[in-house]
């Protein structure tokens, strides 16, 4: 990914998406090859410091959040990469930023509720606001639309579209199973299958019937209407 680019990673279950994210976020050591993140070579730099420049949000992060803590606290603790508020000292500016990020992600009316009482969409928004707390250079979102209903999905898509227009984070990567979940402003795509990349580049050249059909093992029709992508199985004649 280059500065200013917004990428989507697509592929079926077992294609390697989670493994790729784990390596890119420096939580899994590669068995072969080399990895460079923000100009630093993995293994030749302090991964703990570099991780602070990579924001990560997904269901695994949400599962580690204490249900009795509020979104404000859970967002704020990301300032030090923690989940508990007891081990670090926080300034008033940290609390203000946490509340601003929460409000920006549509949580203004829920910032003081226990996390465990939030809806799936509100939990997802908390996770994303938390990932933005350290002002990362790269933001990685692992299936941000998973388990959301239609309204929650569309509202979150609109927020991610607004985020894509901003200068920070410098690059954003979203992982998904569905073309319908690609936000506007995401202009590049990587398609994985069987642990390898089938295609990578501008969406127009990658999101094609043949490439996605090979990835998912189906005859697909890929279309684009009003800048939103869709894919459906081709009917048998």
Segment roles from a protein language model:
Residues 25:
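Helix-to-loop junction immediately C-terminal to a conserved catalytic motif
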Residues 187-202:
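H-loop (His-switch) and adjacent beta-strand-loop-beta switch element
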Residues 215-237:
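ABC ATPase nucleotide-binding domains
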Residues 139-143:
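Catalytic Walker B motif of ABC-type/P-loop ATPase nucleotide-binding domains
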Residues 135:
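Conserved catalytic motifs of ABC-family nucleotide-binding domains
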């Amino acid at each position: 990914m280059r500065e200013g680019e917004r990428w989507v990673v697509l592929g079926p279950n077992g294609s390697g998406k989670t493994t790729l994210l784990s390596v890119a976020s420096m939580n899994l050591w590669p068995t072969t090859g080399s990895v460079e993140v923000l100009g630093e070579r993995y293994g030749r730099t302090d991964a703990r410091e570099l991780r602070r420049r990579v924001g990560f949000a997904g269901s695994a992060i949400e599962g580690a959040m204490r249900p009795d803590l509020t979104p404000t606290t859970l967002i704020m603790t990301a300032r030090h990469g923690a989940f508990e508020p007891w081990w670090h000292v926080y300034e008033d500016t940290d609390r203000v930023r946490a509340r601003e990020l929460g409000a920006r992600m549509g949580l203004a009316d829920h910032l003081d509720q226990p996390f465990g009482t939030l809806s799936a969409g509100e939990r997802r928004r908390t996770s994303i606001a938390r990932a933005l707390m350290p002002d990362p250079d790269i933001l990685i979102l692992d299936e941000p639309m998973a388990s959301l209903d239609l309204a929650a999905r569309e509202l979150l898509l609109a927020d991610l579209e607004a985020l894509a227009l901003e200068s920070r984070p410098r690059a954003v990567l979203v992982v998904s199973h569905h073309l319908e979940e690609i936000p506007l402003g995401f202009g590049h795509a990587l398609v994985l299958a069987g642990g390898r990349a089938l295609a990578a580049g501008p969406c127009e050249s990658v999101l094609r019937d043949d490439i996605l059909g090979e990835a998912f093992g189906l005859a697909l029709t890929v279309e684009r209407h009003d800048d939103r992508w869709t894919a459906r199985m081709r009917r048998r004649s």
